[in-house]
Amino acid sequence: MAKLILVTGLVLLLNVQLGSAYNLVCYFTNWAQYRPGLGSFKPDDINPCLCTHLIYAFAGMQNNQITTIEWNDVTLYKAFNDLKNRNSKLKTLLAIGGWNFGTAPFTTMVSTSQNRQTFITSVIKFLRQYGFDGLDLDWEYPGSRGSPPQDKHLFTVLVKELREAFEQEAIESNRPRLMVTAAVAAGISNIQAGYEIPELSQYLDFIHVMTYDLHGSWDGYTGENSPLYKLPTETGSNAYLNVDYVMNYWKDNGAPAEKLIVGFPEYGHTYILSNPSDTGIGAPTSGNGPAGPYTRQAGFWAYYEICTFLRNGATQDWDAPQEVPYAYKGNEWVGYDNIKSFSVKAQWLKQNNFGGAMIWAIDLDDFTGSFCDQGKFPLTSTLNKALDIPTAGCTAPDLPSEPVTTPPGSGSGGGSSGGGSEGSGFCAGKADGLYPVADDRNAFWHCINGITYQQHCQAGLVFDTSCNCCNWP
């Protein structure tokens, strides 16, 4: 009995020391800095207490070597990795690739042993130089989108060689081993064409399953971005387009549940309804919904942009079979996730013993708390609490929850925040949007519900009316 008590106490002690049994992996995108006004987001805006792992997206590749993409990546790398000074348990990774990167550079790199070795050597040097703890491979996708069938096996070879090189480097440098993870497909045909699941799972630390973009305007009818379950009426391949099916497919085909990280989107897909009175799931559509004022991409709204849509009178509904919400107003329709659906999915994740959650992306959450009246980072915080992520010993940043107030026209010292007075000043009577400031090319007016906010581009950039964005002069 004494031994049993001792063992039980030891297990409890280990659980306390190790923290949560789950991981919360949060992507940050290096183009979020270019969003206007309150949407602009940089590493300093990240709360380092929310996630167990942060991933910087994206790096590129030239001549089979990892490279920066943005002009200020090196500066942002430092700010990103400095977040570990405020959370000693935080791990940071650098993601390479992404959808827009395509497949050709990966195909060339994996095609020969020499090319792979060139890549691996450059990765180790790069990660150590800039202070990252690992590499996230975002090849979308091996064996698809122009990638030849042999890349399925060569991807396994690459991951195996990366893992072995990381292990050897850790011994030689007497430093913790660099992690190797991958963001992988949710579409069954892409999974089958791209991944040797049992073999890959031996070498990857985490498998980040991109369980979103399961429906969009490309379908020609409304659908949820990331439904937990299928609709009762869905048959054939449509019955595969849900989080539950995809995650269990990976598990049933050889991936350990504890390495599988479930994708959670902090954005929604928008549609134009063909008939504004037909508003349910599966309603005919005629294309993408309009771009949001911050993310500026047709068919796509950040969570905080969705909150504005809801606040402006959209009808909200709950898709009970799929455990996710949708909303509509006029001919605009959005399928998305909210606090309730994140909570439901987190409980399902725990019941199925998956390794944790991955969010795309932390810069799409309501990080200022200005849009949704749910506090700062409401979606990410929901997962943090649901997965029992420890925050002891971590120092959160003090983000402003409202724009810094300065009289319209008086200017400010830079940054992305301005201010104004309700119903007065430049924006009185004007439509919501961004407007140039006549005597200051670095500044712009941001009008929201008649309220005037003067905001500034980053130093060296000017407000460009052709794109309503900050651009090089």
UniProtKB/Swiss-Prot annotation:
It is found in: Cytoplasm; Secreted. GO terms for biological process: apoptotic process; chitin catabolic process; immune system process; polysaccharide catabolic process; positive regulation of chemokine production; production of molecular mediator involved in inflammatory response. It comes from the Eukaryota. Its EC number is 3.2.1.14. InterPro entries: Chitin-bd_dom (IPR002557), Chitin-bd_dom_sf (IPR036508), Chitinase_II/V-like_cat (IPR011583), Chitinase_insertion_sf (IPR029070), Glyco_hydro18_cat (IPR001223), Glyco_hydro_18_chit_AS (IPR001579), Glycoside_hydrolase_SF (IPR017853), Glycosyl_Hydrlase_18 (IPR050314). It catalyses: Random endo-hydrolysis of N-acetyl-beta-D-glucosaminide (1->4)-beta-linkages in chitin and chitodextrins. PANTHER family: ACIDIC MAMMALIAN CHITINASE, CHITINASE. Interacts with EGFR. This is Acidic mammalian chitinase. It comes from Rattus norvegicus (Rat).
